[in-house]
């Protein structure tokens, strides 16, 4: 019975017979039924593997030899003193310091209770296994009153140590000999007889200061030189200043103005070209130039030319019309001054007397050098010029005293045309006729000249005919070039 009942139940669990009434009755759909409880695989089965975890952290440190410091001494050398410690006397023997027992192990050292009071553990230096701390003097300790002065080390016996050590620690060194700690006070070596400086006394301090203040270092500026080495001797050539006395002779005059020529106009100054005037301005070696004097007590301001003519203010337009030159009087003064300078100025003498400078002159300084570029030579004075008009001007102004240029307003005559133009600016007139007066007859301008009526009529007729012919020619040319307009 039980077997017969289990078989249909197992089939019912596995399959479900589902018939749809709308579809064909002969077709039956069978599908698997999900179990009520989930099924898990066994933990130890082959299908379940633990997940693999990757760690990026640092690896665990592995100690290969843990007892390194138990069986070996430390790499740091033990505490010891040298023969030249600072503050200690210089000795040739040294006292070796015993090794600190905390590194070598305290064999047979009895264990210490963990619950000692703080005061006793601090004051009892022999109870700890570490190196002793810096000795301090504790005034509240009751044994400090009974401590004798023999336990304290004075400054004379050990000057490099503290004057107030701990009395408990000093007593523990004398009593406890089983713990071999390093006592800094026992590092002092035996006293010998070193070579030390004399003892410093306060009584001689004032005298030492006075001696140090009065002492001055002395230097020997004449050292002994061996015979095989060359020595520098004094240069006797530079002892005298006579060679440099006549290098620059500055004339102490107050009229030392570096000015442009008086005849320069505005246009010539702007263009920086005085080509018509500066061709003969090549200064020779004997000419002296005057500059502003240096502020010295010996400087005298002597003015050779006592008067100075007033320069008239002229408009720039008149300056640009005609380039003017110095007047005839100035040229004559220039020539006279140049002749006098030739006679007075001589070659520099051997003595140290200052050279006599030529008197200041107002005109241009003429060149007396034999310049090959100056091809025009004066027959009378052998002066050379670069241009022929310069030679003619020289002839008329100096030798012949010819004055062919005359002013129309006042009748004054001039040897040069630029002098006449400069003089004409003083008048208020208009046009100036600058012609050579060969027949010594003065000419007048057009306003004063009589004009014939026939000539005026003929001139007007000719001008009218020329104007009409020009107009006809222009009209014919315009008709030929005219295009035909498009007619719509």
Curated annotation (Swiss-Prot):
Its main location: nucleus. One of its GO terms (molecular function) is RNA polymerase II cis-regulatory region sequence-specific DNA binding. InterPro entries: VerF-like, Znf_C2H2_sf, Znf_C2H2_type. Pfam families: zf-C2H2. GO terms for cellular component: chromatin; nucleus. Disruption phenotype: Shows remarkable defects in conidial yield and virulence. Decreases tolerances to hyperosmolarity, oxidation, carbendazim, cell wall perturbing and high temperature at 34 degrees Celsius. Significantly reduces the resistance of conidia to oxidation, hyperosmolarity, wet-heat stress at 45 degrees Celsius and UV-B irradiation. Leads th repression of conidiation- and virulence-associated genes and affects also expression of stress-responsive effector genes and cellular signaling factors. SUPFAM superfamilies: beta-beta-alpha zinc fingers. PROSITE patterns: ZINC_FINGER_C2H2_1, ZINC_FINGER_C2H2_2. It is found in: Nucleus; Cytoplasm. A zinc finger (C2H2-type) spans 376-399, 405-427. Keywords: Cytoplasm, Metal-binding, Nucleus, Repeat, Transcription, Transcription regulation, Virulence, Zinc, Zinc-finger. SMART domains: ZnF_C2H2. Transcription factor that acts as a key downstream transcription factor in the HOG1-MAPK pathway. Plays crucial roles in the regulation of conidiation, virulence and multi-stress responses. Acts as a negative regulator of proteases, lipases, as well as of the red-pigmented oosporein production, and contributes to virulence and growth in response to external pH. Contributes to the ability to infect Rhipicephalus microplus (Acari, Ixodidae) via the cuticle-penetration requiring route involving proteolytic activity at the host cuticle. PANTHER family: MIP31509P (PTHR40626), RESPIRATION FACTOR 2-RELATED (PTHR40626:SF13). This is C2H2-type transcription factor MSN2. The lineage of its organism: Eukaryota, Fungi, Dikarya, Ascomycota, Pezizomycotina. The gene is MSN2.
């Amino acid at each position: 019975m039980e077997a017969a009942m289990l078989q249909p139940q197992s089939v019912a669990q596995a399959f479900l017979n589902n018939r749809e009434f709308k579809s064909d009755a002969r077709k039956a759909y069978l599908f698997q039924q999900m179990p009520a409880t989930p099924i898990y695989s066994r933990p130890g089965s082959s299908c379940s593997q633990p997940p693999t975890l990757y760690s990026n952290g640092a690896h665990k440190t592995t100690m290969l030899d843990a007892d390194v410091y138990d069986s070996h001494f430390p790499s740091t050398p033990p505490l010891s003193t040298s023969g030249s410690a600072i503050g200690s006397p210089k000795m040739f023997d040294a006292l070796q310091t015993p090794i600190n027992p905390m590194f070598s192990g305290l064999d047979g050292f009895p264990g210490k209770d963990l619950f000692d009071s703080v005061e006793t553990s601090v004051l009892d230096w022999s109870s700890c296994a570490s190196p002793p701390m810096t000795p301090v003097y504790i005034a509240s300790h009751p044994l400090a009153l009974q401590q004798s002065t023999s336990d304290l080390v004075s400054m004379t016996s050990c000057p490099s140590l503290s004057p107030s050590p701990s009395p408990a620690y000093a007593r523990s060194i004398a009593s406890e000999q089983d713990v071999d700690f390093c006592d800094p006070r026992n590092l002092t070596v035996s006293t010998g007889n070193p070579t030390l400086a004399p003892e410093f006394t306060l009584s001689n301090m004032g005298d030492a200061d006075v001696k140090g203040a009065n002492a001055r270092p002395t230097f020997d500026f004449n050292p002994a030189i061996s015979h095989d080495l060359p020595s520098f001797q004094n240069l006797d050539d530079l002892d005298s200043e006579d060679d440099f006395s006549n290098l620059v002779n500055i004339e102490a005059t107050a009229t030392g103005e570096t000015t442009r020529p008086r005849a320069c106009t505005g246009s010539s100054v702007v263009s920086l070209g005085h080509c018509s005037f500066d061709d003969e301005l090549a200064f020779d070696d004997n000419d002296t130039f005057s500059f502003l004097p240096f502020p010295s007590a010996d400087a005298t301001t002597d003015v050779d030319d006592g008067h100075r003519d007033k320069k008239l203010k002229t408009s720039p337009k008149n300056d640009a019309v005609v380039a003017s030159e110095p007047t005839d009087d100035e040229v004559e003064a220039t020539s006279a001054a140049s002749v006098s300078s030739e006679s007075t100025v001589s070659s520099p003498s051997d003595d140290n007397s200052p050279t006599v400078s030529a008197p200041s002159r107002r005109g241009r300084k003429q060149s007396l050098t034999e310049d090959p570029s100056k091809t025009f030579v004066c027959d009378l004075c052998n002066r050379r010029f670069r241009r022929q008009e310069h030679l003619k001007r020289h002839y008329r102004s100096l030798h012949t005293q010819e004055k062919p240029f005359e002013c129309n307003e006042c009748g004054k005559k001039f040897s040069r045309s630029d002098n006449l133009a400069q003089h004409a600016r003083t008048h208020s007139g208009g046009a100036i006729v600058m012609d050579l007066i060969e027949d010594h007859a003065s000419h007048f301008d057009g306003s004063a000249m009589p004009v014939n009526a026939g000539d005026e009529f003929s001139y007007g007729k000719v001008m009218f005919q020329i104007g009409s012919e020009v107009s006809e020619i222009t009209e014919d040319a315009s008709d030929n070039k005219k295009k035909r307009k498009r007619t719509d």
